[in-house]
């Protein structure tokens, strides 16, 4: 690397947020520098070797719909597919895969190498370079290299001020064996940005050759044909099984007797951890009445013996970890390869960001991933795409990419973060989306790809695939929307309703016992339609009556969303607002009345006062 170089966008960090940010900016035509401590580790899965899940699978598919990399890499590395909530409606089903760590990292690095607009820079990000006017001008590396750019995306993960804990051990770093980013953390704190600490953890890694698999409950890969990426229709990697075991009373006794050695209970770690992924010591403490907790044994790859025991994240001392492990069925003789640990790191209060994920007080700086207070690969990837795209669009003087919560889970997450902030690592859940009936994982491309194409965020090759997909979708719709004749009921074994209601072919699928397979008797052409596309059309029809009930609510909300609020609005000058309301609104700085309505604690009366005040000023 030369002593200086000029780019449009600099991305700091080569994890899930950083790679998607760099890729999005490059797809929009920006010259991108991707700065990483160690480029050989770009795309590493730091914790669990899995992509997707409940809510998270929706984010994965939405990133894919906008031509991101995560789902493609997941398919290239998937050694175990599983559709979570498969027995429930499609709106809350979550596609999830178990990945071969090496294959996933290799897939990301292959995609990176093929992207001409990205230059990978090895080094430590030491300080943001600011112009005299306080706007971003680039980045200084620890070795003295100066990178010039008008936009920087910080995707620092757990490395920003990272510190590791295991029992009495304390280590500086963002991941075991890797240094943290402390100079950059110091600069951000010195800039008086609102910052705090959060915590996450990881379980020990086990030697699969020392596990008695024969005694455990197997969990096979799904036999279906679904894939992570809409643009991929084949599974190419050999499939393996995972296994399930449980902790027990003896496991809990060992943990309880050693809580005084856990940094979570000694006060060494004061930061909040992820609510939906607690450590095993936290589980034992909070749920003392439980006689056991499930542990999912997940192989980390096809050519490794390492196994990830999902469900027992811990920062207990290594000797306690091993003793606890050997009380679990199937693990009585297990060998621990790497002990678990916890990591505490800096994050920025996401309420300091606007909806593009730009730092309001530091124009030209965008943030994505754990620096914004989230947890999870999928949450990070989605933010990376938004931040990277908006950084490039800003440099080009174009309108930003804003995804609404009514059209995407990405929009839900960004809205939640910039309005509500976080007190613990934020994880996406389907329950967070009030429009979840329409935001299914299977229709992400139909919802979002047109927007990506319009922006230039979707490559021509993917746009061509989308056009073919939509043509196929239209053909499926035409076949299924055709009217049903009286004789058709008997032809597929259904009783004649006798209610005189005119029905379409697709309506027959609401009858008990009716299936798409039986419908092919009436419509043989259905056999030639891609099953994923056909399923999406059928689910659209199933959900249509329920979605229709929400339309009035959506129109009412849209009316509120349309009322823009002045970014410099003096809430203290609005009559009828309590001091508490003024403080909440001044901190969150909502951009629309609809956003103001979702700020925790803001009352309908306060919204009315703001609306009246805004309309008076606009008159």
Swiss-Prot record:
Keywords: Cytoplasm, FAD, Flavoprotein, NAD, tRNA processing. Its cofactor is FAD. The keyword NAD applies. It comes from the Bacteria. One of its GO terms (biological process) is tRNA methylation. GO terms for cellular component: cytosol. The keyword Cytoplasm applies. FAD binds at residues 13-18. Belongs to the MnmG family. Homodimer. Heterotetramer of two MnmE and two MnmG subunits. This is tRNA uridine 5-carboxymethylaminomethyl modification enzyme MnmG. It comes from Sphingopyxis alaskensis (strain DSM 13593 / LMG 18877 / RB2256). The gene is mnmG.
């Amino acid at each position: 690397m030369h002593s200086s170089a000029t780019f449009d966008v600099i991305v700091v960090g080569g994890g899930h947020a950083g790679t998607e940010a760099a890729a999005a900016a490059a797809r929009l035509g920006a010259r991108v520098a991707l700065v990483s401590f160690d480029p050989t580790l770009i795309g590493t899965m730091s914790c669990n070797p899995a992509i997707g899940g409940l809510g998270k699978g929706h984010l994965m598919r939405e990133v894919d719909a906008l031509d991101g990399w995560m789902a493609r890499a997941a398919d290239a590395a998937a050694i175990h597919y599983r559709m979570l909530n498969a027995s429930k409606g499609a709106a809350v089903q979550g596609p999830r895969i178990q990945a071969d760590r090496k294959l996933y990292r290799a897939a990301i690095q292959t995609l990176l190498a093929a992207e001409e607009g990205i230059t990978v820079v090895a080094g430590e990000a030491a300080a943001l370079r600011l112009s005299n006017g306080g706007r971003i001008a680039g980045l200084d590396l620890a070795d003295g290299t100066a990178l010039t750019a008008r936009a920087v995306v910080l995707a620092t993960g757990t490395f920003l001020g990272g510190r590791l804990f295991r029992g009495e051990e304390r280590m500086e770093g963002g991941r075991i064996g890797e240094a943290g980013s402390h100079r950059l953390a110091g600069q951000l704190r010195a800039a008086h940005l609102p910052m705090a600490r959060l915590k996450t953890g990881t379980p020990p890694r086990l030697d699969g050759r020392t596990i008695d698999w024969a005694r455990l409950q197997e969990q096979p890969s799904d036999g279906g044909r679904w894939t992570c990426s809409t643009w991929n229709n084949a599974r190419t990697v050999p499939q393996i099984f995972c296994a399930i075991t449980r902790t027990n009373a003896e496991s809990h006794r060992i943990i309880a007797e050693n809580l005084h050695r856990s940094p979570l209970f000694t006060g060494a770690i004061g930061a909040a951890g992820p609510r939906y992924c607690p450590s095993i010591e936290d589980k034992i403490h909070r749920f003392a009445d439980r006689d056991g907790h499930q542990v999912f044994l997940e192989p980390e790859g096809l050519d490794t013996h390492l196994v990830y025991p999902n469900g027992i994240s811990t920062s207990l001392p290594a000797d306690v970890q091993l003793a606890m492990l050997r009380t679990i069925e199937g693990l009585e003789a297990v060998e621990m390869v790497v002990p678990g640990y916890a990591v505490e790191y800096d994050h920025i209060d996401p309420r300091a960001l606007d909806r593009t994920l730009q730092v309001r007080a530091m124009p030209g700086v965008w943030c994505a991933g754990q620096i914004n207070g989230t947890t999870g690969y999928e949450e990070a990837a989605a933010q990376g795409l938004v931040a990277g795209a908006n950084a490039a669009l800003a440099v080009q003087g174009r309108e930003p990419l804003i995804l609404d919560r009514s059209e995407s889970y990405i929009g839900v997450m960004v809205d939640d973060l910039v309005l509500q902030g976080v007190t613990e690592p934020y994880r996406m859940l389907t329950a967070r989306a009030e429009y979840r009936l329409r935001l299914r994982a299977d229709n992400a491309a139909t919802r979002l790809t047109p927007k990506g194409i319009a922006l230039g965020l979707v490559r021509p090759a993917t746009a061509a695939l989308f056009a073919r997909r939509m043509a196929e979708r239209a053909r499926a719709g035409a076949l299924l929307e055709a009217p049903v004749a009286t004789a058709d009921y008997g032809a597929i074994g259904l009783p004649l309703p006798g209610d005189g209601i005119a029905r379409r072919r697709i309506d027959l699928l609401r009858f008990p016992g009716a299936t798409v397979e039986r419908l092919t008797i009436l419509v043989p052409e259905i056999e030639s339609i891609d099953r994923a596309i056909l399923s999406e059309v059928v689910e659209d029809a199933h959900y249509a009556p329920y979605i229709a009930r929400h339309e009035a609510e959506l129109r009412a909300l849209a009316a509120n969303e349309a009322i823009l609020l002045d970014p410099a609005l003096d809430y203290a000058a609005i009559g009828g607002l309590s001091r508490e309301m003024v403080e909440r609104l001044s901190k969150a700085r909502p951009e629309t009345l609809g956003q103001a309505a979702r700020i925790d604690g803001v009352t309908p009366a306060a919204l009315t006062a703001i609306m009246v005040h805004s309309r008076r000023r606009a008159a």
